[in-house]
């Protein structure tokens, strides 16, 4: 026996049914433990983004978001990722150049964008067909985001985003 092209619809069905939350959660715990920053996972829903998973930093001063919290899609680091990758979403505050830079770099760093004393780094999570599936962020007090730490945080979350994307069927 040998596989034919008929397997593709079944494979696509399987890959699109993968649960990004279930795949991402153990990685989110690991990166939280490594970086001591809160880790969040967002999905787009119309003009909003929803936090579907959260692993809070284990320290008294942290950026706190609750699972199920809904935000305007264009706010914060996660919103900038959605704005750069979703064709049907255009943020009036984001230029075509900024959008192209985000897609080229594959991440966004914000400081005080949505919450004055918080900083965040966001990366896209892709699925089968390299479709934007979700956005993962790490966030914490703005004082934690020194130049040296940002390099460490960025390196870790970019690797994590690529790892989860590959498990979701992306071919980056």
Labelled PLM ranges:
Residues 2-89:
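Amphipathic alpha-helical effector-binding/dimerization core
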Residues 33-34, 112-118:
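Short loop/turn motifs at secondary-structure junctions and domain boundaries
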């Amino acid at each position: 026996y040998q596989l034919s092209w008929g397997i593709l619809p079944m494979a696509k069905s399987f890959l699109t049914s993968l649960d990004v939350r279930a795949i991402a959660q153990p990685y989110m715990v690991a990166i939280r433990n490594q970086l001591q920053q809160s880790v969040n996972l967002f999905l787009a829903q119309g003009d909003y983004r929803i936090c579907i998973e959260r692993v809070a930093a284990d320290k008294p001063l942290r950026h706190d978001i609750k699972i199920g919290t809904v935000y305007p899609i264009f706010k914060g680091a996660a919103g900038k990722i959605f704005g750069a990758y979703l064709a049907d979403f255009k943020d009036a505050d984001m230029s075509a150049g900024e959008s192209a830079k985000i897609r080229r770099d594959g991440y966004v760093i914000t400081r005080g964008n949505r919450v004055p004393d918080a900083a965040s780094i966001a990366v896209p999570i892709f699925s089968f067909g390299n479709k934007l599936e979700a956005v993962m962020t790490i966030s914490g007090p703005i004082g934690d985001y020194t130049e040296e730490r940002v390099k460490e945080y960025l390196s870790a979350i970019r690797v994590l985003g690529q790892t989860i994307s590959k498990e979701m069927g992306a071919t980056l």
